[in-house]
Amino acid sequence: MRRLRPVATVLGALGLLAGAVAVVTARVDVPRFVVVGPASFAPILLCCTVLGMLLCLAVRRWWIAGASASVLAIAGTVVVPLYVADAAPSAGTPITLMQANVMLGEADPAALVASVRDRGVDILTAQELTPEFVDALDDAGMSDVLPYRFAMPYPGGAGAGIYSRVPVTDGRELDGYLLSSVTARVDLGTGPVRVYAVHPVPPYPTPTPVWAQEMAMLRDELRTAADSPEPVIVGGDFNATHAHARFRALLTDGWSDVGDAVGAGIVPTYPTDKSYPPLVGIDHVLVRGVGATSSTAVDIAGSDHRGLVVELALR
């Protein structure tokens, strides 16, 4: 054990440093990649802190273990609530929404349509639509399953769309975003519901200040939507995690993340096209005036994202 002490001390110190980086970058709102980048991987950095703390406990390096425990306690104020459901599942008219990034239109359209059909999806919010992929979805039967849509597909995969089993009205594309984000209304029998499919740019390779600006624009859009009495649902590839201050700033004015509301915890959704598991949870469904029942991550064949299927309750 004595021989292991120097190694454990070094690893423990590195773990402590990793945790400190995670905590600091998650707490500050600085639109620079040196801050935003590490925050994206905060859960992984905190796992390093846990391992380092355990090693230091084993070799009795108490001060490193104690400091690591303090860092983890601070991080826990953000992480632990993600695993605790807000309340009992809400009563109301049940609806199922799927959120899917289709990777520049490279996802398998037939598999996506089958997933929508098998899961009884009422609304699909999709990002990275191309004109060819929209046509391929129709050929695969999407128009039979979700016959109504408001979609703005673009060559290269910059598009977005909302598909629905009931008519879609008042569709518009949000101004000022490099990648398309759209909104429209649907009525599932309880009155109009505003739905968004959003896609802020990533903080890299896009300049991080542009990402920060688009997140601020989205915050303003959601604040405006909160002024309306109608329920609102936002499905999107936010290119942001709960460790980003800009994402948490969206969760005000009555907004909640469905995964957070049902206690789903940290759900990595990207990337899925590598030899290792997805590392970051950047796909989310936000709601206001809508109850949340469940949230499940699902595979999107051919995409580099996992999708989300959420069960909601319209009050």
Residue spans of the language-model regions?
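Soluble catalytic domains of enzymes that build or remodel membrane lipids, polysaccharides, and related
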Residues: 97, 103-117, 126-315
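Intrinsic structural disorder
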Residues: 1-2, 190
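N-terminal, active-site-proximal structural segment of metallo-dependent hydrolase catalytic domains
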Residues: 2-139
